[in-house]
Structure formats: C-alpha cells, structure tokens
Amino acid sequence: MNRRDFLGILALGALLNFESFNDLAFAQVNGSLQGSELFANKEFSYQALRALSKTYSSCADIKECFLAIKSIKDGDTNSWFEGWKAQGDRLYSLAEEYYSEGFLVSARESYLRASNYLRTSGFFLGANPKDPRIFDTYAKSRSSFVKAASLFDPKIESVEIQYQDTTIPLYFVKASNDQTPRPTIVMVGGFDSNAEELVMDWGFGAIKRGFNFVAFDGPGQGRALILQGLYFRPDFEKVSKPIINYIVTRKDVNLKKIAMFGVDLGGYFAPRACAFDSRIALLVADGGVFDYYSSLTSLLPPVAKNLLETDKAAFNKAMAEALKDNITFRWAVHHGMWAFNAPTIADFFLKTKPYNLKNIISNINCPTLVVNSTNTFFFKGESKKFYDLLECPREMINMTASEGAEEGSQVGALGFAQGVIFNWLEYHLNKIVG
C-alpha cells in the first residue's frame, strides 16, 4: 500500500462522522437542539430516546429520563454511565423499599424502570468489554427485571433452555392465567439487545392482544454474551430449534400459530430460523437483513474495503485511528469484536461474511412481513433486498418520519409500530385454522 492509499484510508475518520449516523437525522440550527434531539451527539440522542420510549410500556418515566439526561455531559460516556446509573440505583432502592412494605404493584413498576435505566447506563461500556462495570450493571439490571417478573399475574416465567453444554435464558409471558392454547410470538433480538428489553418494548403489547410472548438471549446477546461468554453464530437454527422444541411442549401454546419476530440483526436470525423450521407459521423481519457483510462494508470507502481483503494489519491501524473521534462507530466496532469473538477490527468485519441468506432464502415458505425503517443506517437497503428475493407470500411496510416511526426498531414510536405489526400478525394468525 502506497502513502497515497494510506492517507485515503485515514480519511475514513472524516467519513465516519456522519451527520445522520445510526438512525438519526435531527437538525441542529444555530447551536440549538431541534425536533426530537436530546443531545448534540447523535448516538447519545438515539440511546436516550430508546430509554425514554419505554414510557409507552410503563418501563420509564419522562422526568426521570430528563433528570438523567440533564446530568450528562454531551459526548462523555463516563458521564452517561453515571447519569443513568444514578436513576437506576435510585429506582432499584425504591423498589426494594416498596416490596418490603408490601406495595407490590409499585415495587414491580419501579423494578422495571430501574432495569431500563441500568441497561441504558451500561450501553457504551460495550466499547470496552474488559470494563468490570459492564458485568455488575447488567447483572443488576437483569436482577431488577426478574424481580419485577415475579410480581405479575400470571408471573413472567424465567426458563433455562438446554443449549450445547450450557443453557440460554428465556422469558415466557403468558397472555392469561389459564391453559388455553394461544398464538405465540417468539422474538429474536439483534446486535445489542437483551431479552428483558424485548419484553418491555414488545411483550407487554403482545399479551394485551391475546398472544403469548417469548423472548430469549441467544449467543452474542444479553446474558448469553455478558455473563456466559457465548458469541454470535451464523447458523442460528441451531439456537432457535431448542427454543421451538420447548415451546411446542406447552399446553398453553397453539402449535399451529407460532410466529417468529426478529428486530435489527434479528432480521437475519429470524428468517434463518424459519428457513429450517416448518413449525413457524409466520415471520416478521424488522428490518430484513439479507447480507450482513455487504451491508457493513458498504459504509467503507472503496480503498478501505480493498484493504480489508488484502492487508488486515494496515486496515486495523487505519480504522483504529478513524474510530478515535466517533463514539457511535467506535462502540459498534468494539462491541462487534466482543460479540463475534473477533480479536481485531478486520476480523470483526470478516466474521460477518457467513451471515447471509443467499442459499436459503427460498426455503422460507411462511407468510412474511418485512418492516423497513426509512431512517435506518447500518442495514440501509437490506429490507428491500430481502423482500425482493423472498419467494413466499410477503408484504413490506415502510415506517416513515410522518408517523414518527422512521428510526431503527421504531424507537420512540412503539405504540404505532405495535399497532402495525401486531395487527398484521393477528390478521394472519386468525386465518390459520386450528
């Protein structure tokens, strides 16, 4: 590689300072924050909105979120950790107090908010998985959720599913206290989600509509990654089959009405599961991911992509320099290195190559809904590509700014998103006889 090429790859640092990076395209005019922007830093804004959006399911409160936001120095990840952790710790202590006094509804709601804020506090720690705060904060966030789960009626069940020589955690949220066989939604998270958050964002909305709801941490996600050291794997059917095997043993599940719902990178995992399991009757991909490597490397200038394939050492050096001043991409790459068990930046990129549906998409036979958030960034264009190549009955819905639902995973517009997606599921599940 000559000096000119190396200078070109170093320019990647400038290219990574996207004004609309990671699902946000808020305007900043004359130094004032406009629209929904909560921080000048785009990733801080998106993650704060992610926490705040859980007010829809009573897993956040507006002023508590604003107290955290107000205490945070924009762009300072340590300040972010302290600001959200303070709220999480306060709510956890309050929940413990309520519980000891027998105020169980108040305890449950406070545990849920504590879990959300503690998860949020640890978000940027994923850029350094050796930071011990990751493990302590996640463990407390999960513990808070599990305590809340025990206070529902019916209780949210915590189940351990046998996986290889260990187990993976699953939550089963029943629609009712009886044993009536009901339609069941199995939700698969993405690159940085955990099962607790899936229940908060989607599970409570599902049971209102008479669906059972299942969420789990697969390898590379939540507890499986943070506390067990299990990493992402492309052959996700090896993960999903034990989950479905468990679900079909339950008397409260209608075996003909099992739907798989994947969000973010789950838009690859869920279709993969459906391609290998005919027991799944419906698929929702929010949004679809046809080829992870192609999508990820499309963010790179041509010289960088070429370098990735030909000179890993030079690519690593240039990328490390480029990431210094970009919080979002630095977090994404370093978290990816951790979740994919990749020793270097180049290895992370290259390890995404097998994550594609090229040879199996024709095996997806169930009716499929593809959800495309129009302001997504990492998987831009993937939903349309996935939709176009499907051979099964399919529909695609665009989530747009006019509905407030344009962000990835419809953060900030969960009520609207639930209406659209759950209505589609309800309509198609009702058409299935049995």
At which residue positions do the language-model features occur?
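Hydrolase active-site cap/lid region
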Residues: 275-343, 372
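Alpha/beta-hydrolase active-site loop
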Residues: 231-251
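Short beta-strand/loop motif that positions the catalytic acidic residue
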Residues: 364, 370-372
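Conserved alpha/beta-hydrolase "acid-adjacent" motif
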Residues: 377-382
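N-terminal cap/lid segment of alpha/beta-hydrolase-fold proteins
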Residues: 84, 139-177
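N-terminal export signals
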Residues: 5-26
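Catalytic histidine-centered segment of alpha/beta-hydrolase-like enzymes
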Residues: 402-415
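Catalytic histidine neighborhood in serine/cysteine hydrolases
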Residues: 390-405
